[in-house]
């Protein structure tokens, strides 16, 4: 294997959603170089950051019925029972919610936490307050999915944040998803909430780092001898 090939293998691909932004930063950098070289170098740094933001690395997803996988890179910010948003149609009783906060330095491609069929997609406009705040789940712009699985209906909510102003969805109602499959992204910092049906046992705690498509958030088969899984 050549050195060049080894280097390329370590550089994650860029998601196509990022091309216009990276191109814009690069063009602005050229103009800044023309105006004053130090400003141009600042533009180069911002262009590199933008490319890193839209990186889309390959992930190895644990596969077994009953596992719930992290839908986003970031930090687990909340693990607590709350009443899910009304648009999910999951009832008015508290369900276990696991929240992952994504900073502007995290990869922002979102992946399905489970394998199943998309039963519902609901978009709701809203504000852009700090996504780390609990009230962001009620006040902020969000896009919600309900995924039907053998373990029950899983709610996944993309929440825009203080900097994030655009939620992008790649899927439609009725489509089937594989665990770890890409289903959307949020531009420039945000939060993902996962609502578990009864019986899901969280395996993460607040402050833990989550890796989209790899970290196991919860398991519906704890106590059933079903902890063995494979990776695809």
UniProtKB/Swiss-Prot annotation:
GO biological-process terms attached to the record: phosphatidylethanolamine biosynthetic process
Modified residues (Pyruvic acid (Ser)): 190
Catalysed reactions, semicolon-separated: a 1,2-diacyl-sn-glycero-3-phospho-L-serine + H(+) = a 1,2-diacyl-sn-glycero-3-phosphoethanolamine + CO2
Membrane topology qualifier: Peripheral membrane protein
Cofactor-binding details, from the entry: Binds 1 pyruvoyl group covalently per subunit.
Residues the record marks as site: Cleavage (non-hydrolytic): 189-190
Catalytic residues (positions): 190 (schiff-base intermediate with substrate)
Cofactor: pyruvate
E.C. number(s) listed in UniProt: 4.1.1.65
Keywords assigned by UniProt, alphabetized: Cell membrane, Decarboxylase, Lipid biosynthesis, Lipid metabolism, Lyase, Membrane, Phospholipid biosynthesis, Phospholipid metabolism, Pyruvate, Zymogen
Top-level taxon of the source organism: Bacteria
GO terms of molecular function: phosphatidylserine decarboxylase activity
Subcellular location: Cell membrane
Entry similarity comment: Belongs to the phosphatidylserine decarboxylase family. PSD-A subfamily.
Quaternary state and interactors: Heterodimer of a large membrane-associated beta subunit and a small pyruvoyl-containing alpha subunit.
PANTHER family recorded: ARCHAETIDYLSERINE DECARBOXYLASE PROENZYME-RELATED (PTHR35809:SF1)
Full protein name: Phosphatidylserine decarboxylase proenzyme
């Amino acid at each position: 294997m050549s050195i060049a090939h080894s280097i390329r293998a370590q550089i994650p691909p860029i998601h196509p959603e990022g091309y216009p932004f990276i191109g814009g930063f690069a063009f602005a950098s050229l103009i800044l170089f023309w105006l004053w070289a130090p400003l141009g170098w600042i533009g180069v740094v911002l262009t590199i950051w933008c490319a890193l933001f839209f990186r889309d690395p390959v992930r190895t997803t644990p596969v077994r019925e009953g596992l719930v996988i992290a839908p986003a890179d970031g930090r687990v910010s909340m693990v607590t029972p709350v009443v899910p948003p009304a648009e999910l149609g999951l009832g008015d009783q508290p369900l276990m919610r696991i929240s992952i906060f994504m900073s502007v330095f995290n990869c922002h491609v979102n992946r399905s936490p489970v394998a199943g069929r998309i039963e519902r997609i609901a978009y709701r406009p809203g504000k852009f307050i700090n996504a780390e705040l609990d009230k962001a789940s009620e006040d902020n712009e969000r896009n919600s999915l309900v995924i039907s699985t053998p373990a029950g209906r899983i709610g996944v909510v993309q929440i825009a944040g203080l900097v994030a102003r655009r939620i992008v969805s790649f899927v439609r109602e009725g489509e089937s998803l594989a665990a770890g499959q890409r289903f959307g992204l949020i531009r420039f910092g945000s939060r993902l909430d996962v609502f578990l049906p009864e019986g899901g046992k969280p395996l993460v705690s607040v402050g833990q780092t989550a890796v989209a498509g790899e970290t196991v958030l919860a398991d519906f088969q704890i106590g059933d001898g079903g902890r063995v899984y494979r990776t695809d």
